[in-house]
Amino acid sequence: HATLRRQRQMCIRDRFSDIIANRQINRLWVVGSNNDTANLIDQSYKRYLSLMEKHLKCLPFMFGQRPSSSDFALYGQLTQLVGFDPTPRNIAYQISPRTVSWVNVMSDLSGLHDSGGIGEFFGVQSKKKDNNKLNYFEDNDYGWIDTNNIPDSLIEIFNEVGKVYIPCLIANAKAYEKGDEIWETSIDGALWKQKTFPYQAKCLKWIKMEFDKLSANDKKSTLDLISGSGCESILE
Protein backbone atom coordinates (compact mmCIF):
# COMPACT_ATOMS: atom_id res chain seq x y z
CA HIS A 1 0.00 0.00 0.00
CA ALA A 2 2.82 2.39 0.85
CA THR A 3 4.43 1.75 -2.54
CA LEU A 4 1.16 2.36 -4.39
CA ARG A 5 0.58 5.55 -2.41
CA ARG A 6 4.04 6.85 -3.32
CA GLN A 7 3.46 5.99 -6.97
CA ARG A 8 0.15 7.87 -6.98
CA GLN A 9 1.80 10.87 -5.34
CA MET A 10 4.57 10.85 -7.94
CA CYS A 11 2.03 10.65 -10.78
CA ILE A 12 0.08 13.58 -9.35
CA ARG A 13 3.29 15.55 -8.86
CA ASP A 14 4.44 14.90 -12.43
CA ARG A 15 1.03 15.78 -13.82
CA PHE A 16 0.86 19.12 -12.01
CA SER A 17 4.48 19.80 -12.87
CA ASP A 18 3.68 19.42 -16.57
CA ILE A 19 0.55 21.58 -16.27
CA ILE A 20 2.38 24.41 -14.54
CA ALA A 21 5.39 24.22 -16.88
CA ASN A 22 3.21 24.25 -20.01
CA ARG A 23 1.14 27.12 -18.66
CA GLN A 24 4.19 29.27 -18.01
CA ILE A 25 5.98 28.36 -21.24
CA ASN A 26 2.88 29.04 -23.34
CA ARG A 27 2.62 32.51 -21.80
CA LEU A 28 6.12 33.56 -22.84
CA TRP A 29 4.89 35.17 -26.07
CA VAL A 30 2.48 37.29 -24.04
CA VAL A 31 5.39 39.18 -22.46
CA GLY A 32 7.45 39.35 -25.65
CA SER A 33 9.73 36.40 -24.96
CA ASN A 34 10.35 34.38 -28.12
CA ASN A 35 13.12 33.25 -30.45
CA ASP A 36 13.30 36.68 -32.08
CA THR A 37 13.77 38.55 -28.80
CA ALA A 38 15.75 35.92 -26.88
CA ASN A 39 19.15 37.41 -27.67
CA LEU A 40 17.97 40.93 -26.84
CA ILE A 41 16.66 39.81 -23.44
CA ASP A 42 19.77 37.76 -22.71
CA GLN A 43 22.21 40.54 -23.61
CA SER A 44 20.27 43.24 -21.74
CA TYR A 45 20.11 41.08 -18.60
CA LYS A 46 23.84 40.48 -18.73
CA ARG A 47 24.57 44.17 -19.28
CA TYR A 48 22.32 45.07 -16.38
CA LEU A 49 24.09 42.63 -14.07
CA SER A 50 27.48 44.05 -15.08
CA LEU A 51 26.22 47.56 -14.36
CA MET A 52 24.84 46.49 -10.99
CA GLU A 53 28.17 44.89 -10.11
CA LYS A 54 29.91 48.17 -10.91
CA HIS A 55 27.37 50.26 -9.00
CA LEU A 56 27.38 48.10 -5.88
CA LYS A 57 31.14 48.44 -5.64
CA CYS A 58 30.57 52.11 -4.82
CA LEU A 59 27.21 52.22 -3.07
CA PRO A 60 25.11 49.73 -1.09
CA PHE A 61 21.85 50.89 -2.68
CA MET A 62 20.69 52.51 -5.89
CA PHE A 63 20.54 56.08 -4.66
CA GLY A 64 23.01 56.11 -1.81
CA GLN A 65 23.50 54.67 1.65
CA ARG A 66 19.85 53.80 2.22
CA PRO A 67 17.21 51.86 0.28
CA SER A 68 14.63 53.66 -1.83
CA SER A 69 11.41 52.46 -3.43
CA SER A 70 13.51 51.82 -6.55
CA ASP A 71 15.61 49.30 -4.63
CA PHE A 72 12.53 47.37 -3.60
CA ALA A 73 11.14 47.46 -7.15
CA LEU A 74 14.36 45.98 -8.54
CA TYR A 75 14.54 43.55 -5.65
CA GLY A 76 11.08 42.22 -6.47
CA GLN A 77 12.17 41.23 -9.97
CA LEU A 78 15.55 39.93 -8.91
CA THR A 79 14.14 37.62 -6.23
CA GLN A 80 12.86 35.48 -9.11
CA LEU A 81 15.84 35.90 -11.43
CA VAL A 82 18.48 35.40 -8.75
CA GLY A 83 16.71 33.27 -6.17
CA PHE A 84 14.33 31.03 -8.09
CA ASP A 85 14.87 30.48 -11.81
CA PRO A 86 18.06 28.41 -12.25
CA THR A 87 19.08 29.80 -15.66
CA PRO A 88 19.22 33.54 -14.84
CA ARG A 89 20.44 32.65 -11.35
CA ASN A 90 23.54 30.95 -12.75
CA ILE A 91 24.19 33.94 -15.01
CA ALA A 92 23.90 36.29 -12.03
CA TYR A 93 26.34 34.24 -9.97
CA GLN A 94 28.86 34.38 -12.80
CA ILE A 95 28.53 38.06 -13.71
CA SER A 96 27.52 39.84 -10.52
CA PRO A 97 27.98 38.12 -7.15
CA ARG A 98 27.36 41.53 -5.57
CA THR A 99 23.85 41.55 -7.00
CA VAL A 100 23.23 38.11 -5.52
CA SER A 101 24.40 39.35 -2.11
CA TRP A 102 22.39 42.55 -2.50
CA VAL A 103 19.18 40.55 -3.02
CA ASN A 104 19.90 38.69 0.21
CA VAL A 105 20.53 41.96 2.05
CA MET A 106 17.30 43.43 0.71
CA SER A 107 15.45 40.34 1.94
CA ASP A 108 16.40 41.12 5.53
CA LEU A 109 15.98 44.89 5.89
CA SER A 110 13.94 44.39 9.02
CA GLY A 111 13.91 46.35 12.25
CA LEU A 112 13.16 49.90 11.12
CA HIS A 113 12.33 50.85 14.70
CA ASP A 114 14.33 52.78 17.26
CA SER A 115 17.22 51.54 19.41
CA GLY A 116 19.17 48.83 17.64
CA GLY A 117 17.13 49.18 14.45
CA ILE A 118 18.43 49.27 10.93
CA GLY A 119 18.19 53.05 10.98
CA GLU A 120 21.14 53.07 13.36
CA PHE A 121 22.93 50.69 11.02
CA PHE A 122 22.64 53.31 8.28
CA GLY A 123 23.75 56.02 10.68
CA VAL A 124 20.37 57.71 10.66
CA GLN A 125 19.27 59.43 13.85
CA SER A 126 15.57 59.15 14.51
CA LYS A 127 13.87 62.44 15.33
CA LYS A 128 10.85 60.87 16.96
CA LYS A 129 11.05 58.13 19.53
CA ASP A 130 8.06 55.92 18.92
CA ASN A 131 8.57 52.18 18.84
CA ASN A 132 5.26 51.71 17.07
CA LYS A 133 6.32 53.63 13.96
CA LEU A 134 8.89 52.97 11.25
CA ASN A 135 10.13 56.51 11.69
CA TYR A 136 13.87 56.46 11.14
CA PHE A 137 13.58 57.89 7.65
CA GLU A 138 10.71 60.29 8.26
CA ASP A 139 11.68 63.82 7.17
CA ASN A 140 15.29 62.72 7.05
CA ASP A 141 17.42 63.13 3.92
CA TYR A 142 20.48 61.39 5.31
CA GLY A 143 22.25 59.00 2.97
CA TRP A 144 20.99 60.09 -0.45
CA ILE A 145 23.53 60.72 -3.19
CA ASP A 146 24.39 64.29 -4.16
CA THR A 147 22.33 65.09 -7.25
CA ASN A 148 25.18 67.28 -8.44
CA ASN A 149 27.56 64.33 -8.31
CA ILE A 150 25.71 61.35 -9.78
CA PRO A 151 27.91 58.23 -10.14
CA ASP A 152 28.52 57.03 -13.69
CA SER A 153 27.29 53.57 -12.72
CA LEU A 154 23.80 54.91 -11.99
CA ILE A 155 23.69 56.90 -15.23
CA GLU A 156 24.66 53.76 -17.14
CA ILE A 157 21.81 51.82 -15.51
CA PHE A 158 19.36 54.52 -16.58
CA ASN A 159 20.78 54.31 -20.10
CA GLU A 160 20.13 50.56 -20.22
CA VAL A 161 16.57 51.01 -18.95
CA GLY A 162 15.98 53.83 -21.42
CA LYS A 163 17.25 51.76 -24.33
CA VAL A 164 15.41 48.50 -23.65
CA TYR A 165 12.46 48.93 -21.28
CA ILE A 166 11.15 52.46 -21.85
CA PRO A 167 10.31 51.82 -25.54
CA CYS A 168 8.21 48.84 -24.38
CA LEU A 169 6.41 50.92 -21.79
CA ILE A 170 5.58 53.67 -24.28
CA ALA A 171 4.52 51.33 -27.10
CA ASN A 172 2.29 49.38 -24.70
CA ALA A 173 0.61 52.57 -23.47
CA LYS A 174 -0.08 53.74 -27.03
CA ALA A 175 -1.56 50.36 -27.92
CA TYR A 176 -3.74 50.42 -24.81
CA GLU A 177 -5.07 53.88 -25.69
CA LYS A 178 -5.95 52.67 -29.19
CA GLY A 179 -7.54 49.49 -27.91
CA ASP A 180 -5.03 47.26 -29.74
CA GLU A 181 -4.64 43.77 -28.29
CA ILE A 182 -1.09 43.31 -29.61
CA TRP A 183 1.70 45.79 -30.33
CA GLU A 184 5.18 45.71 -31.75
CA THR A 185 8.16 48.05 -31.81
CA SER A 186 11.89 48.07 -32.54
CA ILE A 187 14.20 47.82 -29.54
CA ASP A 188 17.97 47.94 -29.92
CA GLY A 189 17.65 46.73 -33.51
CA ALA A 190 15.31 43.84 -32.70
CA LEU A 191 11.58 43.48 -33.27
CA TRP A 192 9.59 43.25 -30.04
CA LYS A 193 6.01 42.00 -30.17
CA GLN A 194 3.67 41.19 -27.32
CA LYS A 195 0.18 41.41 -25.90
CA THR A 196 -1.01 44.77 -24.54
CA PHE A 197 -1.02 44.97 -20.74
CA PRO A 198 -3.41 47.44 -19.03
CA TYR A 199 -1.38 47.37 -15.81
CA GLN A 200 1.80 48.65 -17.47
CA ALA A 201 -0.23 51.45 -19.04
CA LYS A 202 -1.49 52.37 -15.58
CA CYS A 203 2.08 52.28 -14.25
CA LEU A 204 3.18 54.80 -16.86
CA LYS A 205 0.25 57.02 -15.94
CA TRP A 206 1.14 56.82 -12.24
CA ILE A 207 4.75 57.78 -12.94
CA LYS A 208 3.60 60.89 -14.78
CA MET A 209 1.15 61.76 -12.01
CA GLU A 210 3.86 61.50 -9.35
CA PHE A 211 6.24 63.57 -11.46
CA ASP A 212 3.60 66.29 -11.82
CA LYS A 213 3.34 66.50 -8.03
CA LEU A 214 7.01 67.49 -7.69
CA SER A 215 8.14 71.04 -7.16
CA ALA A 216 9.74 72.89 -10.06
CA ASN A 217 13.21 72.36 -8.57
CA ASP A 218 12.64 68.64 -8.02
CA LYS A 219 11.33 68.25 -11.57
CA LYS A 220 14.45 69.90 -12.90
CA SER A 221 16.69 67.69 -10.75
CA THR A 222 14.88 64.59 -11.99
CA LEU A 223 15.14 65.59 -15.64
CA ASP A 224 18.80 66.50 -15.22
CA LEU A 225 19.42 63.03 -13.79
CA ILE A 226 17.78 61.06 -16.60
CA SER A 227 18.29 63.44 -19.54
CA GLY A 228 19.82 61.67 -22.51
CA SER A 229 19.13 58.19 -21.14
CA GLY A 230 15.82 57.72 -22.92
CA CYS A 231 13.99 57.50 -19.59
CA GLU A 232 12.89 61.12 -19.92
CA SER A 233 10.56 60.02 -22.75
CA ILE A 234 8.02 58.65 -20.28
CA LEU A 235 7.55 62.12 -18.79
CA GLU A 236 6.66 63.82 -22.07
Go through the PLM ranges and name each one.
Residues 186-236:
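C-terminal non-catalytic accessory extensions
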Residues 28-29, 33:
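Globin-like tetrapyrrole-binding proteins
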Residues 13-24, 35-52:
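All-alpha helical catalytic cores of prenyl diphosphate-utilizing isoprenoid enzymes
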Residues 39-46, 63-66, 93-96, 100:
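Conserved structured core elements
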Residues 54-63, 112:
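Surface-exposed helix-capping loop/turn segments at secondary-structure junctions
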